[in-house]
A protein has these predicted regions:
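Small, basic N-terminal interaction modules of short regulatory proteins
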Residues: 1-63, 92-102
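Solvent-exposed, flexible loop/coil residues
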Residues: 59, 64, 79, 86
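Short, glycine/alanine-rich amphipathic alpha-helical segment
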Residues: 68-83
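Short, contiguous alpha-helical
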Residues: 82-89, 94-95
Length: 102
């Protein structure tokens, strides 16, 4: 593991933001809070898609891949599919990347 030297201003900001005097632990706390915040944002967006379409992404994806519907070729629907899929992927990556955080 390599050591990281932070500028004094950043170190002070970390302490002020987290209340933790140890830089390393303060950075971990900040990362944890960031990950939680991003997950909350993603969950809000996911719920909006689920409410709009009345189903989970997995159900929507299965229907998308198995049925040929004219409305599925509309730009808005296709765009929603891609954005929804990106949110699901981003959520999984965040959960995996930050699973080690306390």
């Amino acid at each position: 593991m390599s050591a990281m030297v932070l500028p004094k201003e950043i170190s002070q900001a970390l302490v002020e933001l987290t209340g933790e005097p140890r830089e390393g632990m303060a950075l971990v706390l900040l990362m944890r809070d960031y990950a939680r915040h991003k997950l909350e944002e993603i969950d809000t967006a996911l719920k909006q898609y689920e409410q709009t379409y009345g189903m989970s992404f997995e159900a929507f994806k299965q229907r998308w891949e198995s049925q040929d519907r004219e409305e599925d070729y509309a730009y808005a629907r296709e765009s929603d599919y891609l954005e929804w899929e990106a949110l699901v992927t981003r959520r999984k990556r965040l959960e995996t990347s930050f699973a080690w955080l306390p």
